[in-house]
């Protein structure tokens, strides 16, 4: 793990509706490059809201998100570049997956970045092999099991070679077998030097896995 700060939140405030309570209230946070950070806290404590701010899906009403020391820009071109480097795997994979087949799904994001078809095909093939997706590459996404959908969700992000992957409760609603499978995939990500932020309610796993643990309450 490096001492370099790859992601920083400076006095972040966010509310979903005007005059509503703030989901994030003056959050300050620094994340080191290559670190494994577990986020814990009750539902509604601000974990998911912070994650959505990290890659520009949400824009804070106040404060700054910094990536490599530079404030996030909300112009379309810069946001697309940021989202290629800071990827989110949602708690519910059905919110992320939409293409007909697994292979098409994984190909969509990298092709949207303007990568040449041949290079994209090579990258997709490599990621499918890494995450053991090849056996069901031609299957329709809607026909996959929960664990397989989670594999494809992670592949969606990994194929773009991100610097940060955010996992919002990656083992939620999975049986023990698929939970172990997802945890093994997370270990592979960290072995590649990718910075991983993960929300989890599993205290034992968080303490065993993480370099740092962030405890959130009331958006702080």
Protein language model features and the residues they cover:
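The feature captures the beta-strand-to-loop junction immediately N-terminal to the Walker
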Residues: 40-42
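Helix-to-loop junction immediately C-terminal to a conserved catalytic motif
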Residues: 55
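Conserved ABC transporter NBD signature motif
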Residues: 63-74, 82
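Conserved ABC ATPase "signature" region
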Residues: 118-136
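Conserved ABC ATPase signature
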Residues: 140-144, 148
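Catalytic Walker B motif of ABC-type/P-loop ATPase nucleotide-binding domains
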Residues: 165-168
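H-loop/switch region of ABC-family ATPase nucleotide-binding domains
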Residues: 200-201
